[in-house]
């Protein structure tokens, strides 16, 4: 299928605290767009501050999707994201608007843009239930023990995935339990046919500036009540759920339990956030063809002008109606 026959899609990526939310909202105002979150954690209710979830005030009337759709103990896979996002893109496009994906979860973005062969991830409820029971047995194990288990049947994935990346390790195990196939083998035969006419935009800046923004964002989150958010989740019994392994939550659980000081936890949280941002940038630059905009050399308005110029050229073949801009209230 030629690009002219594919739905038009704008994707905004970048590391945490780079300004994706602000750019996506301002862009949506100018191009008659609606925003789909491409963040794996913003789907969860009650996890607002630690995921830097956009507020109703910041949305400023722009529709946002894939936010607050699950409870903290619900499971959510790349395949789930792809199905929901595809339906949303179809709906948004059918109404003459432009869908904008904004987020930092690289695998989610890649699975949506390209034709991932996910057919064999559709499993029966019986198999899925058995898989979940087996995964529950792994919960008490350490990261290294879970990683060692993965290595018994998929040594290549064990080699590719760090033991501390528990989420990816568990995803590889879950894939095997559901399909009896190795996720490492699937990647080798993966197709990369583009599903959409995609304008892929990335935000970058110097490491020094990015790390400063990350540290400031953590301080802002704490000032807005991140500790109480984590405490409330722990008190509701969500401590052992997969969602609570996210950065911003796992670091503060020991504080809630009286096992660590808040100062130590904050330093760890900032360090983990900086490390995650570095991994995000590496992933995007290795896996996707991104048009990068430097936030230090370009103002927000300069980025918007350049992006809208490109969109106007490409969207002339699509039924899209640009609008006039309004201002944003977004912090970091």
Curated annotation (Swiss-Prot):
Residues 39-42 are annotated as: Interaction with substrate tRNA. It holds the Pfam family IPPT. The keyword NAD does not apply. Keywords: ATP-binding, Magnesium, Nucleotide-binding, Transferase, tRNA processing. InterPro entries: Dimethylallyltransferase (IPR039657), IPT (IPR018022), P-loop_NTPase (IPR027417). Its EC number is 2.5.1.75. Belongs to the IPP transferase family. This is tRNA dimethylallyltransferase. It comes from Staphylococcus haemolyticus (strain JCSC1435).
